[in-house]
Amino acid sequence: QGALPKGNDGLGLMLLGVTGDQMLPLDIYQKIKRDTLTQVRGTVQADILKEDQAQNTCIFSTEFALRLMGDVQQYFIDQGVRNFYSVSISGYHIAEAGANPITQLAFTLANGFTYVEYYLSRGMDINEFAPNLSFFFSNGIDPEYAVIGRVARRIWAKALKNKYGANDRAQMLKYHIQTSGRSLHAQEIDFNDI
C-alpha cells in the first residue's frame, strides 16, 4: 500500500493483491461470504475408504483422513453449507478393482455407514450431515446394474430411518453412475491383451 509512481493515477492498480474484505465494508463482505456458502454447489471427492480398498493410493493414515473429513463436514454444518456434498462415497473404483455389482454396492454402503458412525461419534446430528453425503456407482452390462440405484436407496433410507432416526431429507441417497471402463474392454476381446 505504498506510494504510486509519479504520473500514475492508480486506476487499474487498486485491485492488485486486494481481497474482498479490504474492498467492502466488513458487514457486506461477511454477508456475501455467508450467502455464497449457503448457495454453492459441488462435491468433495475424498473417500478415504475407497482409496484404501480399491486404489491403494493413501498418502495419509485412515484415522487422519477420517478426522479431516469430519472437520470438513463440521465446517459445512457450522457454516450452513447445505448444497455441497462433503464426500462422494465411491463404489465405482471398487468395481474397477474387480468387484461385481453386488459386492460394489455392499462395500459402498458399508463405507457410507462407516462415515455415518464416525460423524455421530463426533457429536454431529444425522439430519445435519446425511444430506451432505453422495454416492458414486459404476455401471455395466450385468443385469444387477439395472437396479443398483433403487436397491441402494431402499437400504440406505430404511437404515437411516430405523437405526438412526433420520428425517426424510437425510434418508435420501443421492448418487451418480458412470459406465465402467472395465466392462467396455470385455466387449472388444480382440483388443484386450489380458
Per-segment meaning from a language model:
Residues 1-148, 163-178:
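Catalytic alpha/beta active-site cores
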Residues 144, 184-194:
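Thiamine diphosphate
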Residues 156:
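Conserved, mostly hydrophobic/aromatic
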Residues 159:
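Catalytic core of soluble alpha/beta enzymes
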Residues 180-182:
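Cytosolic juxtamembrane amphipathic/interface segments immediately preceding
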